[in-house]
Amino acid sequence: MNSKCDVVVVGGGISGLAAAKLLHDSGLNVVVLEARDCVGGRTYTLRNQNVKYVDLGGAYVGPTQNRILRLAKELGLETYRVNDVERQIHHVKGKSYPFRGPFPPAWNPISYLDHNNLWRTMDDMGKEIPSDAPWKAPLAEEWDHMTMKELLNKICWTNCPRQFGTLFVNLCFTAETHEVSALWFLWYVKQCGGTTRIISTTNGGQERKFVGGSGQISERIMNLLGDRVKLQRPVVYIDQTGESVLVETLNHEIYEAKYVISAIPPALGMKIHFKPPLPMMKNQLVSRVPLGSVIKCIVYYKDPFWRKKDFCGTMVIEGEEAPVLYTMDDTKPDGSYAAIIGFIAAHKARKLARLTKEERLKKLCELYAKVLGSKEALKPVHYEEKNWCEEQYSGGCYTAYFPPGIMTQYGRFLRQPVGRIFFAGTETATHWSGYMEGAVEAGERAAREVLNAIGKIPEDEIWQPEPESVDVPAQPITTTFLERHLPSVPGLLRLIRLTTVVSAVALGFLAQKRGLLLRI
């Protein structure tokens, strides 16, 4: 016997549950089918006596992420600021350099020009890319055929900014520079507010976390929906050839609906059989957008000893020998459960996954002791980690990335409906895609597409702006006059050559006027 409803939502992460909540609040009968034994998708809050609670998946929120902040507030959740009071550390070539601000400073004048030009150039290129249609950028084809490795080599004159740009790609996208399309990268950074916003803690994407963990968002929506959320129900078959759409799960339950919302990573669409088959371009798209590789690691200590040394816990670590490339303070807001969270990303995640959990912890502690200059780092009291590459119902983390050539060929089909199937998931968002904010935007947009299809709202209400959060207001990202107008290294060299030529001509003219040149 089939279970009947108005809408089946495939996927019980934040995007699917945000869609289900909006549809439920609009009076529709909705069922959510989640493959795992818990909701949350790529967010997961672990609870035990050693950690109280810890986010092993998506966790951070900040200014301009207004949808997730609004939804969390509706659900009764509060945020707290991630510690960013003390100094950060940039560890490079075996030495630690304290700094403040979003980016480590460059003391070499030539390197400073190169660093500054890298961030300004990437932000300027991003301004040419439409957030809702990156394939329409004037130079979309050229940029999409280029890897980020090629773009960094093209922009950077010196090695230091090239290496830091590589770390930036590894950290933000959990992929290697040769794996990622320059167009997709530039779009991704642009729709997150630019290079400074995406990398910053204060006034950036990592400013805050949720008290009690981000997993509560999905859990509280599940509590509102009750038995409409079905766990351990992997969807394996969707048939929309009849009057209703039939959705079958791995345990052979069949749900009959008017519409379906797919709120899973695009690549997981390959686990579902469709009748009729997906259109050609959509069918090929889902096999061409892999997810990144990351192991999230949290080391606990008896106290936040790094703060005594005037360090906030943020470490930017360069070098192939270092297991993690970025850390942050993960101590609870009341100062309890002192911890440092680190990210093993991209090829390092694939490499270090071969080690045991104990071996990874040892490497982390040895690295932290070296970077922080403290043997206290060698004395952890507890350790938790999550290898997202192992998750068959995620495929990786944080998000799907687009290899070269894919965005311009297939990008326009990412959220295009297929019959009575609509597509959500953070990858389909146009603002903070890859984050919890993007998940909410995508889920609510897909829900409004369904509401439009049944005649409840007009088409022009599908996409809706979001008012700025009163509790977490955004400050503008500013640059100095010098940062905006400094030349690149090649520009400086051209200026020097031009100045030299002009000076030589002027001296020659002056000498001739004064009769100092020999007459032949």
Swiss-Prot record:
It is a single-pass type IV membrane protein. It is an enzyme of class 1 (oxidoreductase). The chain crosses the membrane at residues 490-516. Gene3D superfamilies: 3.90.660.10, 6.10.250.130, FAD/NAD(P)-binding domain. GO terms for molecular function: flavin adenine dinucleotide binding; monoamine oxidase activity; primary methylamine oxidase activity. The keyword Mitochondrion applies. Residues 1-489 are cytoplasmic. Its main location: mitochondrion. The record marks 156, 365, 382 as: Important for catalytic activity. It catalyses: a secondary aliphatic amine + O2 + H2O = a primary amine + an aldehyde + H2O2; (R)-adrenaline + O2 + H2O = (R)-3,4-dihydroxymandelaldehyde + methylamine + H2O2; a primary methyl amine + O2 + H2O = an aldehyde + H2O2 + NH4(+); benzylamine + O2 + H2O = benzaldehyde + H2O2 + NH4(+). Its cofactor is FAD. Keywords: Acetylation, FAD, Flavoprotein, Membrane, Mitochondrion, Mitochondrion outer membrane, Oxidoreductase, Transmembrane, Transmembrane helix. It holds the Pfam family Amino_oxidase. Residues 517-520 are mitochondrial intermembrane. The modification S-8alpha-FAD cysteine is found at residue 397. One of its GO terms (cellular component) is mitochondrion. Belongs to the flavin monoamine oxidase family. This is Amine oxidase [flavin-containing] B. It comes from Cavia porcellus. The lineage of its organism: Eukaryota, Metazoa, Chordata, Craniata, Vertebrata. The gene is MAOB.
